[in-house]
Amino acid sequence: MEHTTTHNNDPLVLGGRALESRLFIGTGKYGSDSLIPRVAEASGAQVITVALRRVDMQAAAGNVMQHIPQHMQLLPNTSGARTAEEAVRIARLARAAGCGDWIKIEVISDSRYLLPDGYETAKATEILARDGFVVLPYMNPDLYVARDLVSAGAAAVMPLGAPIGTNRGLRTQEMIGILIEEIELPVIVDAGIGRPSQACEAMEMGAAACLVNTAIASAGDPVLMASAFGAAVRAGRRAWLAGTGAVLEGQAQASSPLLGFLDS
């Protein structure tokens, strides 16, 4: 695959918005919500996701929304939804509350492993896309589910790298690679990424972006970790744009001549 775009002109376009940063961050699990603006600044992220169930629009204080920088693109999610109908209701409530038209669909009826329901996710995606939402569905990295989501009107697909909150890394790497090759939508790796090196690897594969929450929020120094993830995502993207060298099997190949220079 030939990559002609340079890193100086390489926006990720979603919902009509050109994003310079390909790192998305979350708002959960921080010891204090007051860390969120510092994490956002350190990461360079432009998109931030928040569970609507954590938002109290009537509260004068203690509202996570107060800590989200105004320049950031808000990506409400439907965490807590168990059916398509519940996800649609949450999305419409978010829009009515002034949270915009972007929505991350999470439909999870499995409370142990927190794996997304592909059928219900596609159903919700179709309804909300018709309603004018920019729909980013969280999904298992399954090609057939991804194709259903494309047909349903998704703006991107968000396959999990590992179960939510586990920091296990890219356990589904080969399946994500298939989606990157086959799906004509941005592939945003979501859930399970635990280290900056793993985010870098996802970007080197050709992922359009990474969403990272737990790995940053649970770090000893979340602000410094956010900076590390921002740098890793940029490095991985530049490596993909540059085109990595071929992997040789069998014998080694010298990078400079081994013979002849002593005879000259």
From Swiss-Prot:
Key word Cytoplasm present: yes
Biological or metabolic pathway of the protein: Cofactor biosynthesis; thiamine diphosphate biosynthesis
Positions of disulphide bridges: none
Active site: 104 (schiff-base intermediate with dxp)
GO cellular component terms given for this protein: cytoplasm
Subcellular localization: Cytoplasm
Domain of life: Bacteria
Enzyme Commission number(s): 2.8.1.10
Xref: Pfam families: ThiG (PF05690)
Keywords: Cytoplasm, Schiff base, Thiamine biosynthesis, Transferase
Gene Ontology biological-process annotations: thiamine diphosphate biosynthetic process
InterPro entries referenced in this protein's UniProt entry, alphabetically: Aldolase_TIM, Thiazole_synthase_ThiG, ThiG
Family to which the UniProt record says this protein belongs: Belongs to the ThiG family.
Function: Catalyzes the rearrangement of 1-deoxy-D-xylulose 5-phosphate (DXP) to produce the thiazole phosphate moiety of thiamine. Sulfur is provided by the thiocarboxylate moiety of the carrier protein ThiS. In vitro, sulfur can be provided by H(2)S.
Name of the molecule in the record: Thiazole synthase
